[in-house]
Curated annotation (Swiss-Prot):
It is an enzyme of class 2 (transferase). It comes from Pasteurella multocida (strain Pm70). S-adenosyl-L-methionine binds at L72, G103, L122, S123, P124, L125, T126, L127. One of its GO terms (cellular component) is cytoplasm. The lineage of its organism: Bacteria, Pseudomonadati, Pseudomonadota, Gammaproteobacteria, Pasteurellales. The gene is rlmH. This is Ribosomal RNA large subunit methyltransferase H. Keywords: Cytoplasm, Methyltransferase, rRNA processing, S-adenosyl-L-methionine, Transferase. Belongs to the RNA methyltransferase RlmH family. Its EC number is 2.1.1.177.
């Protein structure tokens, strides 16, 4: 299974890139973890936010192909590390690739939310979108380590 993290926004701060890449490189070859960045639409005081969200959403969905889609969204389901590890096994056994979607400043388009089979909430807090990339990468790596009885995760 290949995991794709599809996120709105490019040109992230160096700490975001370094943090994401630290966990990305730890994933096993049989479970590659890829970041796909979708350019954010231009926002200004006269911007048509609905249209921008639709365009970003279309680009995100096009990048998903036939993979299982899971959105990262506050109203989604929160998982403990152990629950995420179980979920990771379910996704792996499904036989499809996995696309995780992170929206831009206004969130995800209605089309992305409708296409998702699941929605995952990292926290009831609103988190900065760049930080979410790092948190997702670490959380997935930790969940993988649980499934492999790797000593990274300690209870």
């Amino acid at each position: 299974m290949k995991i794709q993290l599809i996120a709105v926004g490019t040109k992230m701060p160096n700490w975001v890139t370094m943090g994401f890449e630290e966990y990305q490189r730890r994933f096993p070859k049989e479970m590659p973890f890829e970041l796909i960045e979708i350019p954010a639409g231009k926002r200004g005081k006269n911007a048509d936010i609905k249209r921008i969200l639709e365009q970003e959403g279309k680009a995100m969905l096009a990048a998903c192909g036939k993979s299982r889609i899971v959105t990262l969204d506050i109203p989604g389901k929160p998982w403990t590390t152990e629950q995420l590890a179980t979920q990771l096994e379910v996704w792996k056994n499904d036989g499809r690739d996995l696309s995780l979607l992170i929206g831009g400043p206004e969130g995800l388009s209605a089309e992305c939310k409708a296409a998702a089979e699941q929605s995952w909430s990292l926290s009831p807090l609103t988190l900065p979108h760049p930080l979410v990339r790092v948190v997702v990468a670490e959380s997935l790596y930790r969940a993988w380590s649980v499934t492999m009885n790797h000593p990274y995760h300690r209870e």
